[in-house]
């Protein structure tokens, strides 16, 4: 089974990816994350240590999303959670949280 977790380098996504990797032995787990947050870059290393591949781009880029390999299951864990960012960068937060989720 091939599983993609969007927001896979975030707190929820990375822990879910590692959990699924341990529970479903023959699963191919992949992550998609834009790595904007510092914690995401650190979690990318954790995922690599568990043999979980990461695709690095923002899900609002639908043309790139369409070029990904086919997956049996996509779990959407991506979002821009920072309240302060939503005040400063309304368009970016809207595009990530709404347009990006629509693309998934």
Predicted ranges, named:
Residues 1-104:
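N-terminal Rossmann-like NAD(P)+-binding domain of SDR-like oxidoreductases, especially those catalyzing
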């Amino acid at each position: 089974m091939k599983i993609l977790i969007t927001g896979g380098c975030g707190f929820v996504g990375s822990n879910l990816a590692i959990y699924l990797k341990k529970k479903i032995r023959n699963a191919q787990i992949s992550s998609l994350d834009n790595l904007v947050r510092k914690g995401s870059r650190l979690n990318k290393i954790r995922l690599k240590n568990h043999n979980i591949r990461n695709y690095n781009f923002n899900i609002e880029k639908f043309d790139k999303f369409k070029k990904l390999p086919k997956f049996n299951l996509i779990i959407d864990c991506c979002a821009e959670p920072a309240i302060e960012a939503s005040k400063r960068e309304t368009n970016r937060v809207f595009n990530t949280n709404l347009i990006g989720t629509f693309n998934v």
